[in-house]
Design a protein with these regions (language model features):
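Short, charged, intrinsically disordered terminal tails
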Residues: 12, 107, 111-119
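Short, hydrophobic-biased segments on the C-terminal half of alpha helices
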Residues: 61-62
Length: 119
């Protein structure tokens, strides 16, 4: 890997770390899945029949918002939250890059082992 490729990989990892950190919580993942399945909802709707308090939901949504996964909009006294699918696509693309890197590394290992065992 060239110095340029190493620098690019480091920058991508630096950019991706907050995204994966935001996804590293069960409650936040549940909120994302809920918004994906049901569409935009208020905090009041999300807290109905939930063991999580409105305050906790608000804090989790703020983390997701800071990472770009959701956006909120005031409608009167309510704050309506919606999923931002592009950010999910960004994470998917990052995971694809990581998978390709592993595929290449495994291919190099396979080639090395086969060359080492050649007569």
């Amino acid at each position: 890997m060239s110095a340029r490729e190493v620098a690019l990989a480091a920058r991508r990892a630096h950019d991706a770390a907050p995204l994966f950190a935001a996804l590293g919580d069960t409650t936040r993942l549940q909120l994302l899945m809920r918004l994906s399945a049901r569409g935009p909802e208020s905090i009041a709707q999300m807290s109905e029949k939930s063991a999580v308090t409105r305050q906790a939901i608000t804090k989790h949504l703020q983390v997701l918002s800071d990472a770009g996964f959701v956006s909120g909009e005031r409608r009167g006294r309510e704050h309506i939250w919606r999923l931002r699918p592009q950010r999910i696509a960004d994470v998917h693309a990052q995971l694809d890059r990581i998978a390709r890197q592993w595929d290449h590394a495994l291919e190099r290992l396979r080639a090395f082992v086969e060359d080492d065992n050649a007569p």
